[in-house]
């Protein structure tokens, strides 16, 4: 439970400053220098705990991973939550349209169109995060998992937009 590691309530909105503060305290206490004189088992346990802290931090900093952790903690399901939106035909069509639009923008090398597209994707992501939070608050776990899958796609799309942006500005 990443929330328990940092002694935080299980919630979608996490106080990032408090998270960073607690991370630094935990990392300091688990630093290898503190275990120089310890036996091999204690060193291994400290290393393992340090890895758990790093993994928990990664989970709590990423809204998709954080939401998936909340869903898993509340449903007891720890299997991969991906592939939930593949039955959403409307979203599948939207994915195809977005990918085609990005491809056309790259081919035309239209920087203004790319900027506009990036803003629309960012807006869609923000709206979907708000909807995800509402589903989590209402304990609608299957729907929340679908939003996680959609957000994962939008994150990949944003990465692709950045790559296209880099290629366009290299010219």
Where on the chain are the PLM-derived regions?
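C-terminal accessory/regulatory regions appended to core domains
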Residues: 1-171
């Amino acid at each position: 439970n990443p929330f328990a590691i940092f002694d935080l309530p299980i919630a979608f909105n996490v106080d990032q400053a408090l998270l960073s503060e607690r991370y630094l305290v935990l990392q300091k206490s688990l630093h290898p220098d503190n275990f120089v004189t310890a036996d091999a088992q204690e060193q291994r346990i400290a290393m393992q705990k340090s890895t758990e802290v790093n993994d928990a931090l990664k989970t709590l900093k990423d809204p998709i991973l954080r939401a998936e952790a909340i869903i898993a903690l509340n449903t007891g399901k720890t299997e991969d939550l991906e592939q939930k939106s593949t039955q959403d035909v409307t979203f599948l069509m939207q994915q195809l349209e977005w990918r085609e639009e990005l491809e056309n923008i790259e081919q035309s090398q239209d920087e203004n169109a790319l900027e506009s597209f990036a803003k629309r994707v960012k807006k869609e992501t923000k709206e979907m995060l708000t909807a995800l939070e509402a589903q989590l608050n209402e304990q609608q776990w299957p729907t929340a998992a679908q939003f996680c899958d959609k957000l994962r796609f939008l994150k990949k799309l944003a990465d692709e937009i950045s790559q296209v942006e880099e290629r366009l500005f290299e010219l």
